[in-house]
A protein has these predicted regions:
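Intrinsically disordered, low-complexity regions enriched in Ser/Pro/Gly/Gln/His and often acidic
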Residues: 6, 19, 80-81
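A general, composition-driven signal for non-globular sequence regions
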Residues: 5, 23-24, 53
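Bacterial N-terminal signal peptides
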Residues: 13-24
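Bacterial N-terminal signal peptides that target proteins for export
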Residues: 2-14
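Compact, glycine-rich, soluble single-domain proteins
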Residues: 28-152
């Protein structure tokens, strides 16, 4: 009887431990963080601490499943070439604003995005970067299209 209990216990615990290990490895990876300055006519408007997403895997995951994103923080999506960009909010549970940024750091568009929305938000022209922040942050700190993003 005792050996049956041990066998049943082992059959239960081993899969449970494997599931726990898998889930914990799926939690938010820490990406490199850089401080970005946003300027207008040489004057500092705001700074944001942005996680830098460069690999395809990092960009695909983005801010999915995050429960919060503090004010003044965000994620910068970096691409090798200029392109029309489209983002959607599948599995993203926090409202975000996105700035589409040209190769030289100029903000081309700022748009709001809504949780779990499958509709794409698209840049109006080819850009090199996209910066996601908490929804309304750009407006709240006075950032506008035409402002310059500088990566420190």
């Amino acid at each position: 009887m005792n050996s049956n209990f041990n066998l049943s216990f082992t059959r239960f615990c081993v899969p449970l431990c494997l599931i726990i290990i898998f889930i914990s490895s799926c939690e938010a990876q820490k990406l490199p963080v850089k401080e970005l300055s946003i300027e207008r006519e040489g004057r500092l408007i705001a700074t944001v601490k942005a996680e830098i997403a460069e690999s395809q895997e990092e960009k695909s995951k983005g801010l999915m499943h995050r429960k919060n994103l503090p004010e003044g923080e965000g994620m910068l999506f970096v691409y090798e070439h200029d392109q029309i960009m489209s983002f959607w909010m599948l599995n993203t549970i926090i409202p975000l604003s996105i700035a589409f940024i040209s190769y030289d750091g100029k903000i081309i568009d700022i748009k709001d995005m809504y949780p779990n929305n499958k509709n794409s938000v698209t840049s109006s022209r080819s850009v090199r970067y996209a910066l996601e922040v908490p929804q309304g942050w750009f407006t709240n700190v006075g950032v506008k299209t035409g402002d310059l993003v500088i990566i420190k």
